[in-house]
Amino acid sequence: MQTFVRVVDTGSFSAAARQLSIGQPAVSKTIAQLEDRLGVRLLTRSTRGLTPSEAGLRFYERARRSIEEADEADLAARGEGAGLTGVLRVSAAATFASLHIVPRLRDFLGSHPGLQMELILDDRVIDLVEEGVDVSFRMGDLADSAATARRLATGPRVVLGTPAYFAIAGEPSGPADLAAHEAIVHTQGRAGAWAFARLGSQVVVTLQGRLRTSSAEGVRAAVCAHLGLTIASTWMFAPELASGVVKPVLQDWTLPGIDLWAVYPTGRLASAKARAFVDFVALAIAGDTHLRGDSVSRRAGP
């Protein structure tokens, strides 16, 4: 398995042979024997060199994981588990990562000098197994009922906009007034009706925005450009709320909070690297007023 992983990582038999300190014929023979045993072609030749086939990519991800877990077991047996090594692939929404993960990475990476990290930043939900992701930080409801997830926090949602926008459009005095406002809608976020609650009563409102964007950063930019108001998590506008660039309204009404989850790939045990990083993030955000700490582990459900 290690030989195959090195070939995929380097893109050639010769480079893998140099890294493994063996001859190129030995590498070629090992791969041929592996393909014969599995009964599938694992590698294809292209202008970029050797690339894994669809079956090869599936085998590569599992083989890489097995090698990493074996290395971690060796470290644990020798009492060296604190020194995490290898590559940790983390997925998160770009805005959340920029505001709440990246600023905290120095301490984590400083504690694990042998560890490398890759951040896959995308507002869309990606296939963690296909992308080789160790852990993903997701907001809101989880659709994958087979995924293993840990809830790290629940953050409040508010209606907000800039003082300049409200100076022109006026501040809403109740949820029903939102129908008369320009709304910025996040198409990758929560959709549908919003239930506002106050003193036992409930008002349901659907935002009808003319401006829709697929990214949280697009929502932030549009709101800060005075184009309208939005319903958003306070973590998403933490710097702007602190500086007064945006202001919340309808604060005597409450909206459903939004959960922050750490999600692990389906069918895999969480690696020591992933568990350590999730523990670190959970501790780091425990005092964040925009992400009220509320750590709960469970299987993700609808």
How should each PLM-predicted stretch be described?
Residues 61, 114, 234-243, 253-302:
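C-terminal effector-binding regulatory domain of bacterial HTH transcription factors
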Residues 146-157, 161-184, 199:
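Flexible hinge/capping segments at coil-to-helix
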Residues 47-50, 57, 68-91:
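Short helix-loop hinge/linker segments at domain boundaries
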Residues 35-52:
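A short LG(V/I)-centered, amphipathic sequence patch enriched
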Residues 204-248, 255, 266-267, 284-288:
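Hydrophobic hinge/microswitch elements
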Residues 85-148, 294-302:
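Central regulatory/effector-binding core of bacterial HTH transcription factors
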Residues 6-21:
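Short helix-boundary/capping micro-motifs
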